[in-house]
């Protein structure tokens, strides 16, 4: 059967730290990276909590609420118009440099690629089109379809149902260890994209099938 790749979007294909330059213009270089990282962490925390509580809201709501929290926590440095500009920037984040070439090679090898995200299909489409990556994907599978978030086991089953793939032939490609562990627990093969030397994998005793430092290494490791 065909090998199917499910690509996480935020943090794997698309650089969520692409807001740092704009934050620097508002807060200065010293505070921008801290703010961006805290915003991202809080965004994911809100998605986890909403998933567990079964109090679903669009991922964009998690993003907006996390921005408000982070601004309050770190000293109310951003005005309301600046926050709106950041949210607009979040809808057009850049792709990582390795994404386009890696996806092109995988397509040429006949490997089916899907985008698989907490974000809505509309939001992911906008991101991928802006980054010129949309043509490499057969489809977008959004967790919004079932009103939950990764790593709920139901979202991994939803992907299999929508892609008509089987666990043993499906790979999750993600830089997020919680996502890798979730997919591994669901019976998938997994490729953890370790984008920095400092990145740590959760010590749960559930390890990725492979670890790569760049998407360019997938073509030689995925079978």
Task: Give the label of every model feature segment.
Residues 21-22, 38, 65-69, 85, ...:
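Alpha-helical elements of Rossmann-like donor-binding domains used by nucleotide-donor carbohydrate transfer enzymes
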Residues 1-41:
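Active-site neighborhood of HAD-like aspartate-dependent phosphohydrolases
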Residues 47-84:
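A metal-dependent, Asp-based hydrolase signature
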Residues 1-5, 104, 120-121, 125-223:
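Asp-based, Mg2+/Mn2+-dependent phosphohydrolase catalytic module
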Residues 27-32, 73-78, 108, 132-136, ...:
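Short helix-capping segments at alpha-helix termini
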Residues 81-94, 99-130, 137-143:
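Substrate-recognition element of Asp-dependent hydrolases with the DxDx(T/V) motif
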Residues 32-40, 79-88:
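Short, well-structured alpha-helical segments
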């Amino acid at each position: 059967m065909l090998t199917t790749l499910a690509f996480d979007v935020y943090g794997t294909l698309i650089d969520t730290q692409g807001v740092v330059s704009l934050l620097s213009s508002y807060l200065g270089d010293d505070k921008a990276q801290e703010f961006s990282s805290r915003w991202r962490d809080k965004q994911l925390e809100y998605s986890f909590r909403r998933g567990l509580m079964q109090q679903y809201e669009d991922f964009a709501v998690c993003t907006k609420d996390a921005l408000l929290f982070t601004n309050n926590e770190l000293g109310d440095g951003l005005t309301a118009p600046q926050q709106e500009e950041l949210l607009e920037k979040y809808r057009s984040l850049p792709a990582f440099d390795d994404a386009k070439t890696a996806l092109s090679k995988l397509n040429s090898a006949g490997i089916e690629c899907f985008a698989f995200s907490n974000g809505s299909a509309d939001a992911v489409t906008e991101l991928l089109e802006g980054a010129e990556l949309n043509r490499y994907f057969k489809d977008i599978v959004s967790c919004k379809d079932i009103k939950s978030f990764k790593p709920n086991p139901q979202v991994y089953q939803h992907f299999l149902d929508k892609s008509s793939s089987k666990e043993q032939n499906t790979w999750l490609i993600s830089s997020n260890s919680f996502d890798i562990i979730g997919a591994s627990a669901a019976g998938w093969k997994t490729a953890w994209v370790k984008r920095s030397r400092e990145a740590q994998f959760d010590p749960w005793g559930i390890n990725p099938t492979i670890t790569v430092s760049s998407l360019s290494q997938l073509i030689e490791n995925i079978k």
